[in-house]
């Protein structure tokens, strides 16, 4: 799929219907789904053949959306200002009011989060009403996908 506004809107429709898609990041491709949806999150675990005990990472577009789900402190904010967006993962305490699927975290009280730097993924995240659960787009224990063709080869028409 080419990266244009029409296809970003198409990706949003897939995600809104609890489907999973491949998304580019500045490191590897991610297998993405609505982090608030148990249905989408279950699909990610199933497609990846990932153990449910291995929590997923969640991608956010900005701090205000993150603050809906996680507690932030000055230490985090200083690191955020220095390193984000980019290839760094933070682990933050979830708020009780968070809508993040408990399946994402294996019912733990913390969440691994990122702010990806890839322009296409950021455009998509900005038009969504939810963050994306998006671990690497590969079967668990296999090499991570670094190109769109790798994702298509790995998952075919399942996403």
Language-model segments: which ranges?
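Active-site-adjacent structural elements in enzyme catalytic cores
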Residues: 1-159
């Amino acid at each position: 799929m080419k990266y244009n506004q029409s296809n970003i809107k198409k990706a949003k429709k897939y995600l809104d219907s609890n489907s999973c898609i491949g998304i580019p990041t500045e490191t590897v491709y991610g297998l993405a789904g609505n982090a608030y949806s148990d249905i989408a999150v279950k699909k990610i675990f199933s497609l990846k053949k990932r153990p449910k005990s291995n929590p997923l990472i969640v991608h956010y577009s900005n701090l205000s959306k993150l603050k809906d789900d996680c507690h932030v402190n000055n230490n985090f904010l200083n690191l955020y200002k220095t390193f984000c967006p980019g290839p760094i993962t933070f682990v933050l305490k979830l708020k009780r009011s968070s809508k993040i699927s408990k399946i994402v975290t294996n019912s733990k009280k913390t969440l691994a989060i990122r702010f990806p730097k890839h322009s296409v993924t950021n455009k998509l995240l900005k038009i969504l009403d939810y963050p994306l659960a998006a671990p690497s787009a590969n079967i668990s224990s296999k090499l991570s996908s670094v190109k769109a063709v790798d994702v298509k080869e790995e998952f075919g028409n399942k996403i």
